[in-house]
Amino acid sequence: MTENAQAKPVIELRDITKIYHIGGEEVRALDHATLTIREGEFVAIIGPSGSGKSTLMNIMGCLDTADSGEYLLDGQQIEHYSEDELARIRNRKIGFVFQSFNLLPKMTAQENVELPLIYQGVSAAERRKRSAEVLRRVGLESRAGHKPTELSGGQQQRVAVARALATEPALILADEPTGNLDSKTGKEIMSLFCQLNEAGKTIILITHSEAVAQQAHRRIRIMDGHVRDCGDETAPFGTAEVSPEKAGEDA
């Protein structure tokens, strides 16, 4: 049991199922998945390609909806929200970091960081203030005026992290954030996530890498749409065989 065991649940998935129909066949991307992620946790969700981890992230990030089951974000049932309401939730509560950075090439680092604040209607002066602060936090204040093509891969990912932090979200969802980076730069990005978690951010990291997952405080394995909680840093990773229901109870 981790020190976050009694913290408030941020994400609660209950018996979530997501089915795709491909070539006339039914594919269960998620099969009665149940889990709870609490405030202040640093959780890695690990699985191979096709395991369902991207579908899981999309549902947790309000980018997709389940076919059945219940999803609570900060205690609120997501299924009852409209598309516009879900967009507002994504913008205010969740910061996204993607493998491919997803930076706009014609904009500077600072302008890229300001984008989600524009959608929130934040004033230009406040946008400049906030973007400068988060770029400082990720160590890129001196690169604020540089465009993505003038930055290394690691620097681009730091800009992406800064953009995710700009709206001051409670939750960071990172999808393979080290996947396009060399090992040294990947370690630097993981160190940054650890620092953010120590500062209180709840972080969910999607990865196929055992080494990357080991740096999280808790690890959840997904295989063929089934979720298994592998426990905290004191548990031998990958050995726990926990049912989806049990995973939710023990989280």
What are these regions (language model features)?
Residues 1-19, 229-251:
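ABC-family P-loop ATPase nucleotide-binding domain
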Residues 9-222:
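ABC family nucleotide-binding domain
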Residues 190, 212, 228, 236-237:
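Flexible, glycine-rich phosphate/dinucleotide-binding loops
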Residues 219-232:
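H-loop (His-switch) and adjacent beta-strand-loop-beta switch element
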